Amino acid sequence: MLLAIDIGNTHTVIGVYAGDSLRAMWRIATNRKAAADELRIVFSTLFSLEGLDLRQVRASAVASVVPQLTRAWMQAIEDATGTLSLVCNAETAAGLFDADYPNPREIGADRVADAVAARALYGAPVVVVDFGTATNIEVIDRDGRFRGGVIAPGVQTSANALFTHGAQLPDIALVAPPAVIGTNTVEAIQSGIMLGEADRVDGLVRRIFDQLGYSAKVIATGGLAAVVERYSSTIDEVNTELTLEGLRLIADRAYR
């Protein structure tokens, strides 16, 4: 089995693959202060609850945007499974990831994994919208090259900023209201955050198409992808496993 871990600023997603089949997936809060022993207990417990055996893990891959946690996760994985983790980046993804980009080393691991999976699953050109702490848009051109993209504050990040600085604004559920014109404070905030996010993505995607000179399939991933997709006119498909799938493909090639 392959253990794939996507360490984000807010959430960490853990996936277990048997061949190319995803056997289990968990989404947990990212704890920046967690030590290796704590992390080992976390995923050992998850494996046990799912009836999976850690001793069957033969390889592992990590995509991390939290540098201080990368080593802790790698140590936890090694202690629990005896495997040394492949760390995802533009170099370790070579052969699957071709970048027309001034400095490929600065491309985040999650963006690399998303681009690898999108190109493999959907062909080129393709655009990925990843809804996380940041909303990332990745552009793969018709030649299959990663061209760059957009990084913007994520839905929850924007909402937190609004609630923090607006003393009289209530904390709300991140769902769209029944209509764009809110008839109370909660609906008005939901309209601004959720419908505003969908329109922001649509506007940016159209600008990307204009710059490329052609359109592309648009794939959404991340925690709020399914919610935003309902109100977007440019998103074609939601694939919540995209980042993990990219890690699997990169690891499969590396361990071949």
Sequence positions of predicted segments:
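Phosphate/pyrophosphate-binding loops at sites that engage ATP/ADP/AMP, CoA/4′-phosphopantetheine
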Residues: 43-59, 205-215
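Conserved phosphate-binding catalytic cores of ATP/NTP-utilizing and phosphoryl-transfer enzymes
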Residues: 93-126, 248-256
